[in-house]
Swiss-Prot record:
Protein name: Actin filament-associated protein 1-like 1
Disordered: annotated segments: 83-137, 169-210, 343-380, 561-604, 712-763
Phosphoserine modified-residue sites: S98, S104, S153, S329, S343, S742
Keyword list, A-Z: Cell junction, Cell projection, Coiled coil, Cytoplasm, Cytoskeleton, Phosphoprotein, Repeat
Gene: AFAP1L1
Bilayer-spanning residue ranges: none
Domain PH: 220-316, 413-507
Pfam families, per database record: PH
Main subcellular location: cytoplasm
Record-level GO cellular component terms: anchoring junction; cell projection; cytosol; podosome; stress fiber
UniProt xrefs under PROSITE patterns: PH_DOMAIN
Length: 763
């Protein structure tokens, strides 16, 4: 075959293949190869003689039917192979002799094609807007610019042969240039003013070629658009906003895999603020409680009403009756209705607070004896209702800050937090991860716990270790067999600890030993499984022991005085504040705690809590030690019986062999169960000992002494008033209080003495 004829058949087929690849999700390497093939294809395609100086192929028309080259020549009835090149003089003479023929339909189709893109970047005020996507509609783009460029200056999915100064643009694929990205566009975009839009004339609308070409982010969504989102310090950034199911998702760019912000609409209040003299844009304000979490700017009132309609539909409870046809969102009001309601609240609150004193205050103002005006009256631009709302927001933020500070201070004692690498937009980022209430929170830093970057509800999820040989300590969190998050630990112990904690928080019955581990050797696998088992058993025991979160003052009730002699020996706690025998040894008689039937269950914050904790942990420790000894004895008996069975199997290879083997298997299963129970007891015993040490560490500072278990023979030999051999730690403040005033240094109290002297001089 002729080489030219082969190229003539190959080029349109390659062009069609590239257009089909536009609709598929490709990896970065495959995408680079496809772009390289496209550039080579552009350089190899034959150019029409002296008619076109560059090549333009619109792949939007190539997704089905004949190729682009075939469509140009499908209506010619002549044989193209018989055509030959004519010399220039003959061509000019033919052109002068014959009039210009009428254009065929195919040539008219060629002339109707959109002109090629300019060889310069678009102006600074260029921006693109995605129309709202309703049910059964295809996504659409609106391209807007102030210049007088042709109407179809931007098409979806094209290949061009232009200068290197013009960056390649792909609207439907993964690759986008800097001026089409949402972060860069947010700085060049100025306003949503309707006056400017009216002066621009009709805007061209370009639809995506097919449903297959739509982005994966907007599939199965109720509505989507590129909207302006208000940042922290008042700037506006364009982001892809999507409503899926009952959540609002914000993406910084259409190529992102994870949303930058995820907001549950059923727990938010939405307020629509129309455009007026004070507000330059139509705004939707989303709030949780008294905190405003998101502000979105819309282009027109119709667009805002459409978004509000979708939010109302999403917020309705599923399967509700007519009486329950109220949206779950607490507030869904317009700004005018909100101001009206706030003004009514202001009038009622003013009438309630002033009461009958209005006439007196009016008379006082008329005579010039009224009080000074409040801050809101001096400002003049802020109503009392708005002031009260701001005060509530400030007080709420302070309360939240205090709670978060307390929580941050206690993070060292909680083993359910730490740094993990998180895969975000094809890149790893270090995040402070924290487990709380069956939810995994991601924070930018451990010092900033007030706001979280993302949160994952773990109930119903699964965990799967492994993410390739380059990341042996990575693991994935799956929900309905779809990846929700990909995390990576720093070492094998850290990975095992997180796996055990996540399995407990997910409510899974799978143990860390049952998981399938890849890309690790035997030693690393042993370390991961050991750490995972320890954390799994620790978290499971904590859940069994404390089914509900306990506050610091929540202690069990104290036993009555008539039940105290029934305490087990060796767990006696000396009560300096309640026993009558030790009252005489106290120097400060003012500190007393009376214990009787009416006040037996009343607790003070300090010493009584330490006493109760120490007594409870001592009892629990002894109970666990006894249980451990019992299990050890049973294990020894089972092992002895197992050895005897093995000897019997060796000596009697006959008909009883099968029965002996079954008995041996039963004994081995019992041994394994007892061994697991023993390991569980060991872990619980270690935890109880640590808590006992913590309670005893605060005991001596509060005047608490704990007697450990003493043998009866030693108590008979030693007198009762014997001083302990090792000195107990002493609290300096309590010792100074016990000293007599003569021992205290005389230079104390000079400041008060001087103050009294000055007062005497003044009088």
């Amino acid at each position: 075959m002729d080489r030219g004829r082969v190229l003539e058949q190959l080029l349109p087929e390659l062009t069609g293949l590239l257009s089909l690849l536009d609709h598929e999700y490709l990896s970065d390497t495959t995408l680079e190869k496809k772009m390289a093939v496209a550039s080579i294809l552009q350089s190899l395609q034959p150019l029409p003689a002296k008619e076109v100086s560059y090549l333009y192929v619109n792949t939007a028309d190539l997704h089905s039917g004949p190729s682009f080259v075939e469509s140009l020549f499908e209506e010619f009835d002549c044989d193209l192979s018989g055509l030959q090149d004519m010399p220039e003089d003959e061509a000019e003479s033919c052109k002068a002799a014959s009039p210009e023929p009428a254009k065929s339909p195919s040539l008219r189709h060629t002339a109707d094609l959109p002109p090629p893109l300019p060889n310069r970047p678009p102006p600074e005020d260029y921006y693109e807007e995605a129309l709202p996507l309703g049910p059964g509609k295809s996504p659409e783009y609106i391209s807007s610019h102030n210049g007088c460029s042709p109407a179809h200056s931007l098409m979806d999915g094209y290949y061009e042969d232009a200068d290197s100064s013009y960056p390649a643009t792909r609207m439907n694929g993964e690759l986008k240039n800097s001026y089409n990205d949402s972060d860069a566009m947010s700085s060049s975009y100025e306003s949503y003013d309707e006056e400017e839009e009216e002066g621009k004339g009709p805007q061209p609308t370009h639809q995506w070629p097919s449903e297959e070409a739509s982005m994966h982010l907007v599939r199965d969504c109720r509505i989507c658009a590129f909207l302006l989102r208000k940042k922290r310090f008042g700037q506006w950034a364009k982001q892809l906003t999507v409503i899926k199911e009952d959540q609002l998702l914000c993406y910084k760019s259409s190529k992102d895999r994870q949303p930058h912000l995820r907001l549950a609409l059923d727990v938010c209040s939405v307020i629509y603020v129309p455009k007026d003299s004070r507000h330059k844009r139509h705004e939707l304000r989303f709030a949780q409680g008294a905190t405003e979490v998101l502000v979105l700017a819309l282009q027109s009132r119709e667009q805002a009403e459409e978004w509000l309609k979708v939010i109302r539909e999403v917020s309705k409870p599923v399967g509700g009756t007519e009486g329950a046809d109220v949206p779950r969102s607490p507030v869904l009001l317009c700004k005018a209705d909100l101001d009206k309601r706030l003004s009514q609240e202001k009038q009622t609150s003013d009438s309630d607070s002033l009461g009958m004193g209005d006439s007196c205050s009016t008379l006082g103002r008329e005579h010039g004896k009224g009080k000074k005006s409040s801050l809101s009256e001096l400002k003049g631009s802020m109503s009392r209702a708005a002031g009260r709302k701001i005060t509530r927001i400030i007080s709420f933020s302070k309360k939240k800050a205090l709670a978060d500070d307390l929580q941050a201070s206690s993070t060292e004692e909680v083993p359910c937090c730490g740094y993990l690498n998180v895969l975000v937009n094809h890149g790893w980022k270090e995040r402070w991860c924290r487990l709380k209430c069956n939810t995994l929170y991601f924070h930018k830093d451990r010092t900033d716990l007030r706001t979280h970057v993302n949160a994952i509800a773990l109930r119903g999820c699964e965990v799967a270790p492994g993410f390739g040989p380059r990341h042996p300590f990575a693991f994935r969190i799956l929900h309905n067999r779809q990846e929700v998050a990909i995390l990576e630990a720093s070492c094998s112990e850290d990975m095992g600890r997180w796996l055990g904690l996540l399995l407990v928080e997910m409510g899974s019955k799978v143990t860390p030993e049952a998981l399938h581990y890849d890309y690790v050797d035997v030693e690393t696998l042993t370390s991961i499984v050991s750490a995972g088992r320890n954390s799994f058993l620790y978290a499971r025991s904590c859940q069994d022991q404390w089914p509900e979160p306990r506050v610091y003052d929540d202690v069990p009730y104290e036993k009555m005085q008539d039940e105290e002699p029934e305490r087990p020996p060796g767990a006696q706690v000396k009560r300096h504040a309640s026993t009558c025998s030790e009252k005489s040894h106290r120097v400060d008689p003012q500190v007393k705690v009376k214990r009787h039937a009416s006040s037996a269950h009343q607790y003070k914050y300090g010493k009584n809590r330490a006493e109760e904790d120490a007594r409870r942990y001592l009892v629990e420790k002894e109970k666990l030690e006894k249980e451990k000894e019992t299990i050890r004895t049973e294990l020894m008996a089972l092992r002895q019986e197992k050895r005897e069975l093995k000897e019997a199997i060796r000596n009697n290879p006959g008909a009883k062999l099968k029965a002996l083997e079954e008995a041996l298997a039963t004994l081995e299963a019992q041994c394994r169960a007892k061994e697991e129970h023993r390991i569980d007891l060991e872990l619980r015993l270690v935890t109880v000992k640590e808590r006992l040490q913590q309670s005893l560490a605060g005991g001596p500072a509060l005047g608490l002494s704990v007697n450990s278990k003493i043998k009866s023979g030693e108590t008979a030999n030693k007198p009762q008033n014997n001083v302990p051999e090792q000195p107990l730690p002493v609290n300096c403040v309590s010792e100074l209080r016990k000293r007599s005033p003569s021992i205290i240094n005389s230079n104390q109290g000079r400041v008060l003495q001087k103050a009294k002297e000055w007062e005497m001089k003044k009088t």
